[in-house]
């Protein structure tokens, strides 16, 4: 992305540091990434951008807003942020849909290059204001024949919903029944 290089830090520098410092296994099989809301988007983006680092991605109530903010105009805002924030975070909003800031672009790239796609777990509340975007992304995954664990349930964009799903996605990541 643009702006500060958080994806590089989270996707490359931090995992390498942790593996070396704590003498952990160097393969990606036991390296996961997860997040909630904008962090859910970040987990998908970083997990796909650094697919060689992560084997699994967990994304709860993800802010999959790339299509919403594309073509946004200066001095405008939505429920989350304003044009300036999005421009700093994603770069040229006229080009964001076709950029590596779009998880759909990253998935298509991994597929076309024959690379392994990390396993994906998603959950979103049925009353969450980002439900439509999460459903659309799941539809994209289905159309691309990319398997993902997708869960919906009663709840909004809050910790009450996420707390109910944290244990589920941790068990999924660790493959515990």
Model-derived features: positions:
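Non-catalytic cap/lid and distal C-terminal segments of serine-dependent acyl enzymes
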Residues: 1-177
